[in-house]
Swiss-Prot record:
Changing H178A: Lack of activity. Its EC number is 3.5.2.3. Zn(2+) 2 binds at K103, H140, H178. Changing H17A: Lack of activity. Substrate binds at H19, L20, R21, N45, H140, L223, H255, A267. Catalyzes the reversible cyclization of carbamoyl aspartate to dihydroorotate. Changing K103A: Lack of activity. It comes from Klebsiella pneumoniae subsp. pneumoniae (strain ATCC 700721 / MGH 78578). Belongs to the metallo-dependent hydrolases superfamily. DHOase family. Class II DHOase subfamily. This is Dihydroorotase.
Amino acid sequence: MTAQSQVLKIRRPDDWHIHLRDDDMLKTVVPYTSEFYGRAIVMPNLVPPVTTVAAAIAYRQRIMDAVPAGHDFTPLMTCYLTDSLDPAELERGFNEGVFTAAKLYPANATTNSSHGVTSTDAIMPVLERMEKLGMPLLVHGEVTHAEIDIFDREARFIETVMEPLRQRLPGLKVVFEHITTKDAAEYVRDGNELLAATITPQHLMFNRNHMLVGGIRPHLYCLPVLKRNIHQQALRELVASGFSRAFLGTDSAPHARHRKEASCGCAGCFNAPTALGSYATVFEEMNALQHFEAFCSLNGPRFYGLPVNESYVELVREETTVVDSIALPNDTLVPFLAGETVRWTVKK
């Protein structure tokens, strides 16, 4: 990374966790990612979910059809794990270069996850096959038992699911996605080379007070939900330390405005337009800009065993105002930090 006083030049980053949706929403949101990122790990929680090689190939084509001319972008597809998934289908997809990884959603943990896994025992043959193949398992790390408080679900997942699973399958490569707690930050930090984490901009920039004090801010509502300040600070300290197994994963998750601003609003922040500048702001605040490029562009490829991108992007330190909304055919999208003044923007 080269840093002049007002410009950051880094290798083209990748987004290791994104929701691109489908149909009109897909066509609207893809360019915000393909413009700045070389690759993205695309979540498979469509309706119906992406559980076959054929479905992944078709979805990948729909994504590519939405990439504007001149954008150099490769979607990396994932398989949605279900209790009934055939290990042979997963292996075929991985060997043919269709599936980069597989996604474990505990049933009903987040948007469109009702088909998710009821227990890791139910998919042990699949996980054993993944361990053998060296195929990464991407984990939404929350338990979903009704009696467990929503703010405790990540920490409880580590104790009851993640650690027993990694003990049982010590060769399994695992990405603990969108970590939100001090517990998870310490667990990943103290883990071995087969355990990594993605972290979103919203969990680095905000805590639950920002979402709940002085009025509910539905566009900060995502899952896993924002936690206490102590957890936010632990995440910030982890990335500022230059820890090499944490990397950029926006979890950008668009929903139309009427689905967010509702009596029962959807979870997800559409942060693709503003994420890169948001991360830069956090690293600057932590006096850690020397680690910014590794977090965005180097750590992820190293963990996945992929080459780093050859091209570069530049971020400029100048105040700009984020647009209030982005048009959809029958509604609008409200981007993360809508209407706010931001410090860093990507040079176009």
